[in-house]
Design a protein with these regions (language model features):
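Active-site-proximal loop/turn and secondary-structure-junction residues that shape catalytic pockets
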Residues: 33-34, 76, 104, 136, ...
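Active-site/binding-pocket entry motifs
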Residues: 34, 106, 228-230
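CN hydrolase (nitrilase-like) catalytic-core segments centered on the catalytic cysteine
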Residues: 50-71, 139-220
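Active-site catalytic loop in hydrolytic enzyme cores
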Residues: 78-150, 164-171, 233-239
C-alpha cells in the first residue's frame, strides 16, 4: 500500500474525530472511502483486508460517539470473495448495513470481478426515506426518475470521479435534484486540479445550491430540511395548480413509451 492511501484514511478519520458529539445528524463520505487511491486489484485487496478493517470499525465508533448517522462508500468482500461497491450506513447503537450496491459499473470494475447490484430500493432512517447512487450511477437519469416515483426524501450520491470537469458535476447534480424532486447530497474526493473531479455539494429540490466544496479538499456542514419539496408556481391562471413539482409530474409519466 502506498503512503497516500493511508494518508487519505487518516485524513478522513481525523476529520471525524474533530466533530463534537451531538453537533450533527448526518455525515457522508465518498465512494470507496476505505480503499481510495488504489492502483490495481492487488493493492485494493491489500488495503481492504488490512487498514480498511480498522477504518470501518472507526466509522461505527464515531457514529456512536457523535450520535450521528454516517454513510460512506465502501468496497466490500463477502465470505465467498465477491467484491461489491456499496454504501455503508452506520447508526448509533445499531449494526452497520449496506442498503445499496452500485448498479452501473464501469469496465475497469467489471474486469476486477466487482459484482453489480440488482435493485434500487429506498431505505428509511429516522423517518427519512433515502435513495442512493454511486459514481457512474449518477449518469443514468432513469435511476433518479425511479426514486422520484418511490417518493424519496433525500438521494445520497457517493462518488470518485477523476476526470469530469467540476462544472459538469454541478450541472448534473442540479439536474438530478429536479429529476427526483428532492434534496441531493453528493460526496466526492477532490483531485489535484481544482477544475477536475471533486464537487461535494448539496442541492435543494428546486435546484438551488445549499453548500458546495468546489474542487478543493475539505469538510462542508450545513442545515437542510429532508422533507423539503419544490412547490411549482401556478400556471394557466389556475391557482389550484400550485403543487409539489414532483407530484405534478407523476400522473403525466408515460414509461410505456420509452421503457420497452
Amino acid at each position: 500500500m502506498h503512503h497516500e492511501m493511508q494518508e487519505t484514511l487518516d485524513w478522513q478519520t481525523s476529520r471525524l474525530a474533530a466533530i463534537l458529539a451531538g453537533s450533527v445528524d448526518l455525515i457522508i463520505l465518498p465512494e470507496n472511502s476505505n480503499v481510495t487511491g488504489y492502483r490495481d486489484l492487488d493493492e485494493m485487496l491489500s488495503i481492504l483486508r488490512g487498514p480498511s478493517v480498522a477504518y470501518v470499525q472507526t466509522l461505527q465508533k464515531e457514529a456512536d460517539r457523535i450520535g450521528a448517522v454516517i454513510m460512506a462508500g465502501l468496497m466490500t468482500q463477502d465470505e465467498k470473495g465477491v467484491l461489491r461497491n456499496q454504501l455503508g450506513v452506520f447508526q448509533p447503537g445499531k449494526p452497520a448495513i449496506t442498503p445499496y450496491t452500485k448498479n452501473h459499473l464501469v469496465v475497469p470494475e467489471l474486469k476486477k470481478g466487482i459484482k453489480p447490484g440488482d435493485e434500487a430500493n429506498l431505505f428509511e432512517i429516522n423517518g427519512v426515506k433515502y435513495g442512493c447512487a454511486i459514481c457512474y450511477d449518477f449518469y443514468f437519469p432513469e435511476l433518479f426518475c425511479h426514486y422520484a416515483k418511490l417518493r424519496a426524501d433525500v438521494v445520497v450520491i457517493v462518488s470518485h470521479q477523476r476526470q469530469e470537469p467540476t462544472d459538469n458535476l454541478l450541472f448534473l447534480t442540479r439536474a438530478r435534484a429536479f429529476d427526483t424532486g428532492c434534496t441531493i447530497l453528493r460526496s466526492a474526493p477532490a483531485m489535484d486540479i481544482p477544475a477536475i473531479g471533486g464537487r461535494s455539494i448539496a442541492v435543494a429540490p428546486n435546484g438551488k445550491v445549499i453548500a458546495d466544496a468546489g474542487g478543493t479538499p475539505g469538510v462542508i456542514s450545513f442545515d437542510f430540511d429532508p422533507h423539503a419539496r419544490f412547490i411549482r408556481p401556478a400556471s394557466y391562471t389556475e391557482t389550484d395548480r400550485v403543487v409539489d413539482y414532483r407530484e405534478s409530474l407523476q400522473p403525466a409519466c408515460r414509461p410505456e413509451l420509452y421503457f420497452k
